[in-house]
A protein has these predicted regions:
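An acidic/histidine-cluster motif and surrounding catalytic segment
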Residues: 1-43, 47-212
Length: 212
């Protein structure tokens, strides 16, 4: 099957206009679920593709049983733990704390279905929901090296000012503490203990798909 490619609305999902960004991500996932494709590469339209991007997406497609979602770039740098090395030498890395952003990532059809269920109600901005592995349970990684760059174009979505009351901020602080406990427990259970090497069967290599 071919991986699909989708360019989402430009800009970060961080502010008052983020509902459209949220819905555009869900529309891409629904497109994958309703298709015959096994994976999709979801991209924002203001990114720069680096050398090796297409071979990386094809290799990720061929090794899709080992992951659910894989970023090809992250906004912020976080400590990484190696999960796997692929035949090309590309590595798939685990992070306890994800680098935020949904500029470019691969997702499997099964993961897209689960993320649609998880994001059925808008609770968090979509890039925040994407990172909440301890809730949605998806195997979320990032590639090393990264194959996409953000040229730093201005976003169409501006930051939201904090208009919460003192009581609301206090309640949010309590919930963040509970979430840190849940996140730490999830990471301790699922963090790779030792890196693995993934081989691609000849049949899969011969059926190398192309990006749409």
């Amino acid at each position: 099957m071919q991986p699909d490619a989708s360019a989402a609305t430009a800009g970060r999902c961080r502010a008052a206009k983020s509902a459209g960004c949220y819905l555009s991500r869900r529309a891409a996932w629904l497109q994958l679920v309703q298709s015959s494709n096994d994976t999709m590469c979801v991209m924002e339209d203001d990114i720069t593709l680096l050398d090796g991007f297409k071979p990386a997406t094809l290799e990720l497609h061929d090794t899709r049983h080992h992951w659910d979602m894989v970023r090809l770039m992250g906004i912020t740098k976080r400590p990484q733990v190696e999960y796997a090395t692929l035949p090309s030498g590309m590595r798939i890395m685990w992070m306890d704390s994800h680098p935020t952003g949904t500029q470019c990532y691969m997702i499997t059809r099964q993961a897209a279905a689960r993320m649609l269920a998880y994001t059925a109600n808008i609770v968090h901005a979509i890039d925040i929901a994407f990172d909440r592995s301890w809730e949605h349970g998806q195997r979320l990684y990032i590639t090393s090296p990264e194959y996409v760059a953000d040229p730093g174009m201005p976003t169409m979505i501006t930051d939201r000012s904090d208009s919460r009351t003192f009581g609301q901020r206090l309640k949010a602080k309590y919930h963040r503490k509970i979430e840190r406990i849940s996140s730490r427990r999830f990471n301790d259970e699922h963090r790779p203990k030792r890196p693995i090497t993934i081989e691609i069967a000849p049949a899969a290599a011969e059926a190398t798909p192309t990006l749409a």
